[in-house]
């Protein structure tokens, strides 16, 4: 039975990196025993220019009718002055909300070939492989009431509300523990339970869910300490699970441990495992159209798609090995280039991954 994948290239370098992912998906169809149907839609600034909205109804319908979504990137300086309701990023948020994509998975893996690209010492980061599981649809980003008001004496006051329901915490905990079962079986829950009541509940529910997974070791850590530990000794972590805002911050911190955000994929999943997959880097309008963007994060997002939404973990591992093989060959896009390696274009990197995939045992 075929799997339908929605391709949402978006803005900036989005179309270029999605084009390389399409090459990989074609190879999967020919050499990976996976039947996929690809259909494209508009999102972000590209959609706004054509339809006046960053998320056209047709794109949302396509996303809802697909087994998985592959997103390039959204945004650019030419849209920053638009009303916030129609800015490109609203298209991304709209899909997350409409599809109930509550679990954001952000792996931080340092490939041994790129250990010199990290700003930390090799002995600190060599072998790094952690997963941050971020709750994506609750917390202070969505809590009500929120806004800016004017007090009686004329001073302005801004306010937001941090709210989490027990059910929201429980479901993200179950995602984290399930992932940990397939890894090193350790979960670190990050909160600020010493000052925030909402995360005191977070800690309680995490401990309750841990009882359902006796094989997994649960630890708790305050977010300020977690930020410090990510820099001091990041390899102590296996799976980190945390709130929306804390995860937003910590995942970017973890990303830079690897030396280049051009290597890092992400997934946003619903309750059933359907998901949207995207590189964590932005639309990079400054290099768009130059053929120098790194497509590996997008290709690795395809690997995550295979693992979490398309029930093809063996092909996911095969694709990840192909990326490693290309790095072993010394091929690099400019963002990960170093003396002694060979600089290649976006398209050449994609072609090399396809070739390596074909010759990697399934």
From Swiss-Prot:
Residues involved in Mg(2+) binding: 224, 248, 252
Root EC class: oxidoreductase
Main location: cytoplasm
Keyword Metal-binding on entry: yes
Site entry (Important for catalysis), positions: 141, 192
EC number: 1.1.1.85
Catalytic reaction list: (2R,3S)-3-isopropylmalate + NAD(+) = 4-methyl-2-oxopentanoate + CO2 + NADH
Binding site for NAD(+): 76-89, 282-294
Pathway: Amino-acid biosynthesis; L-leucine biosynthesis; L-leucine from 3-methyl-2-oxobutanoate: step 3/4
HAMAP family assigned to the protein according to its UniProt record, in alphabetical order: LeuB_type1
Gene (name only): leuB
Binding site for substrate: 96, 106, 134, 224
One GO cellular component, as annotated: cytosol
GO biological process: L-leucine biosynthetic process
Family: Belongs to the isocitrate and isopropylmalate dehydrogenases family. LeuB type 1 subfamily.
Names of the cofactor(s): Mg(2+); Mn(2+)
Any one GO molecular-function label of the UniProt entry: magnesium ion binding
Family annotation (InterPro entries): IsoCit/isopropylmalate_DH_CS, IsoPropMal-DH-like_dom, Isopropylmalate_DH
Keyword terms of this UniProt record: Amino-acid biosynthesis, Branched-chain amino acid biosynthesis, Cytoplasm, Leucine biosynthesis, Magnesium, Manganese, Metal-binding, NAD, Oxidoreductase
Subunit structure: Homodimer.
Subcellular location(s) of the protein: Cytoplasm
Function according to Swiss-Prot or TrEMBL: Catalyzes the oxidation of 3-carboxy-2-hydroxy-4-methylpentanoate (3-isopropylmalate) to 3-carboxy-4-methyl-2-oxopentanoate. The product decarboxylates to 4-methyl-2 oxopentanoate.
Cofactor note: Binds 1 Mg(2+) or Mn(2+) ion per subunit.
UniProt name for this protein: 3-isopropylmalate dehydrogenase
